């Protein structure tokens, strides 16, 4: 895609130089984000979701201190995680896009949720702070469709009376890799904008109408940090870590809740996990006045009959420890820990579904 079609000439050259500088960093994000430099034969290995990386990193460090066991995790995106577990090169894949039950059966996999969190739009617009800008899902989709191209467009201005909006081109940033974060983002946009649903749809990778791609949540955050007048979407912890202003989104009840553990929990409150085969459940655009509209889950995906039963048992020991003892760490990073009833359901699922 031609970058000149996305940005004013004044930003084109800068973005071209930025792309060169960030390319190697973004391509190496998975290696930088690994929880150990190299994996020994005894290490638990996993790959996938960048959404879950902040809490998985904390859990891994604490687990290593308590048990001496290590987790080597590559934060490469949900698509990469699914590809690696299918290739049996890791003990588990992590994805924010659940596999359908029929695909799990075909591949011999099982999956279970780990944590709940939120995906937030983030911006780099001079003078606008976190929570000051409000957008509906429809307008967000129109921005990503290329229908709304300036920050002072009437569609944005009408939602933000009194807020000074620049007469500048919107620089759209999206994911370049197979991404569960993108799956939930595009799933949400498909629910709130018919044009998006018919022209683009949902998926871990879609044909983006406009914008430039960053690899991982890390790459999107890096672009938004450096590109003036940009907008992107990241897991909430990345917004906090990079000090990126977030945008408020109108939810299904017509309210504009702040993104935090409370609003993510409100969205998750109505999730009926007991009715979800293999925990296949998507929480975007959930009902409730306090619900954050782009709330998501990360699933761990593992073989039901692994070739190496000892490594599989080690992975389950880590997940059991994390789900039963990692709530405090998850909450500190503004994720929502799974309720005890769901943890019990997950552990029963392990017993019933996995061998070895």
Label for each model-derived stretch:
Residues 1-2, 17:
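Short hydrophobic transmembrane-like helices used for membrane targeting/insertion
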Residues 15, 35-41:
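Sec/Tat signal peptide C-region and signal peptidase I cleavage site
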Residues 7-26:
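Bacterial N-terminal signal peptides that target proteins for export
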């Amino acid at each position: 895609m031609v970058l000149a079609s996305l940005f004013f000439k004044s930003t084109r050259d800068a973005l071209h130089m930025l792309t060169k500088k960030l390319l190697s960093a973004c391509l190496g994000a998975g290696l930088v984000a690994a929880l150990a430099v190299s994996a020994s034969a005894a290490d638990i290995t996993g790959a996938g979701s960048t959404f879950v990386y902040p809490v998985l990193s904390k859990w891994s460090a604490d687990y290593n201190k308590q048990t001496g066991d290590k987790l080597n995790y590559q934060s490469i995106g949900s698509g990469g995680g699914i590809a690696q577990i299918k290739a049996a090169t890791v003990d588990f894949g992590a994805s924010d896009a659940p596999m359908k039950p029929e695909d799990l059966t075909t591949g011999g996999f099982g999956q279970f949720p780990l944590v709940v969190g939120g995906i937030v739009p983030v911006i780099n617009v001079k003078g606008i702070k976190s929570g000051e800008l409000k957008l509906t899902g429809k307008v967000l989709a129109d921005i990503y469709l290329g229908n709304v191209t300036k920050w002072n467009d009437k569609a944005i201005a009408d939602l933000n009376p009194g807020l000074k909006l620049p007469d500048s081109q919107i620089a759209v940033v999206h994911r370049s890799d197979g991404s569960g974060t993108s799956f939930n983002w595009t799933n949400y946009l498909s629910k709130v904008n018919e044009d998006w649903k018919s022209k683009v749809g949902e998926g871990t990778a879609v044909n983006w109408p406009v914008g430039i791609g960053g690899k991982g949540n890390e790459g999107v955050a890096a672009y938004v940090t450096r590109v003036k007048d940009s907008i992107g979407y990241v897991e909430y912890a990345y917004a906090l870590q990079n000090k990126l202003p977030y945008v408020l989104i109108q939810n299904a009840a017509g309210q504009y809740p702040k993104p935090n553990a409370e609003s993510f929990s409100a969205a998750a409150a109505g999730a009926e996990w007991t009715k979800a085969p293999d925990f296949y459940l998507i929480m975007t655009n959930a009902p409730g006045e306090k619900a954050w509209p782009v709330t998501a889950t990360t699933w761990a995906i593992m073989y039901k009959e692994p070739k190496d039963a000892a490594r599989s048992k080690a992975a389950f020991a880590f997940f059991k420890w994390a789900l039963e003892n990692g709530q405090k760490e998850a909450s500190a990073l503004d994720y929502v820990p799974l309720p005890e009833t769901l943890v019990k359901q997950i552990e029963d699922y392990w017993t019933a579904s996995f061998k070895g």
